[in-house]
């Protein structure tokens, strides 16, 4: 289990907000009344001379590569702020090249692969494999030196398996591996 203490900037202090969480595969859920104290800390009760402030510590469980999403919204929805964190990332860094996977569908039936630290518009050799299926592609990094791809790792006739992504450039070769399908999701 991980715990997050949330802060906000650029929003009015002392105004009522609602704190939301969004678990993958379900609808967003309102979980608490929220206010922003003068320091930007999100609390469920503002302190005063007679009352102690009560910060909201969001506790969450997660699987590897699972994003936790939070939002605060004003009562009239004109003000909104969003945050996300991946408490247990599936990631690898080699020679400044960073590659990571975020679960985008339950049981890793869909993932988003992201990379950074590549040279602007650099040629990338991307090797995707899931079971005995896969292949290599020659692609280019973005002008910012990043890479993003959505992957559906399922293999016909299989209920589960392992997938891997390797990106190679002249300066680095970085790889990540992740399970998918039945039994792949495990709380850390």
Language model regions located:
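Extracytoplasmic/secretory-pathway segments with low complexity and glycosylation-like composition
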Residues: 1-188
